[in-house]
């Protein structure tokens, strides 16, 4: 264990590894029926998940060995690219899936990706750059440029991807807090956030309906509540021990995105309260070790990066599991490490490589 500690924090590494293993088994189970129905191959999604997992592991390895100064140098270009790609969602390149245009299609291919994933993590590095650059400065010198970046990052994706916008906002505000936010700045940001919420959510009827539908999950089962109602049914069916691996009933066209957005519900159905508790415990361990990793950093930049990464992944997991359990409105966010892989898994693995690097024992960053 001491030998491993030289390369990464063992509990953090174990939490990530176990979540990935759970993901492999659960994608195999939750996607089998859909793969067989759509493509005549029950292992279609499983095989693709393994490919993306391998790519993600390579990305994690690369990010683990690349010095943080390299990411610091390319933070602004990456953030700018993310902004441009998110803006491209409003063009013909944007792909509408389940009523939301969150995906971009690469011309000449069948490859789709969510540009918000690029912006989500690029924002962490660029905001960290600004917070370090303007350390000790306030208002016009430091406060306004930083808030502008946070605001632009959130607003550009909020129209089509409100849930990702919330993850970005929480992770960046967490970084701002760590850097020494005072009460006046907190009140200012809170006021601006409420104003944005008012114009983008409270004044848009269909968003308000989506935001509040979880309070009455069985009122409109044929429309907005279909996913949530079936998710709750799956969780309830699983009871304490679950009905068994590969025995889910909800994957038979009852629970849309069973291998993706609602894979936590399938875990609850097949492995019950015990299974979901294990997953929640592993994510709690991830957040706790991520927090400790951030605390032990000697440099402000490293502390901010670790904070942004563990908050982003941790809150995305919280939102996903909260939706499946019926305590949060439907978001469309995947469950990190576990949901069917794609570019989202690759990005999460890349960020995990950086977090593991920062967690190394005795390294001066």
Predicted regions: what is each one?
Residues 97-103, 112, 187-278, 298-305:
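Hydrophobic, glycine- and aromatic-enriched re-entrant/interface helices and adjoining loop segments
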Residues 76-83, 139-156, 162-202:
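Hydrophobic alpha-helical segments of polytopic membrane proteins
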Residues 133-143, 185, 291-311:
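Membrane-interface helix-loop-helix junctions at transmembrane boundaries of multi-pass membrane enzymes
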Residues 51-56, 120, 270-288:
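Hydrophobic alpha-helical transmembrane segments
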Residues 131, 171-185, 249-275, 333-346:
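Interfacial segments of multi-pass membrane proteins
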Residues 1-14, 18-19, 25-159, 321-336, ...:
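Membrane-helix boundary/helix-loop-helix interface segments in multi-pass membrane proteins
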Residues 294-332, 338:
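Loop-to-helix entry and N-terminal half of a specific, functionally important transmembrane alpha helix
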Residues 24, 124, 128, 204, ...:
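Alpha-helical transmembrane segments of polytopic integral membrane proteins
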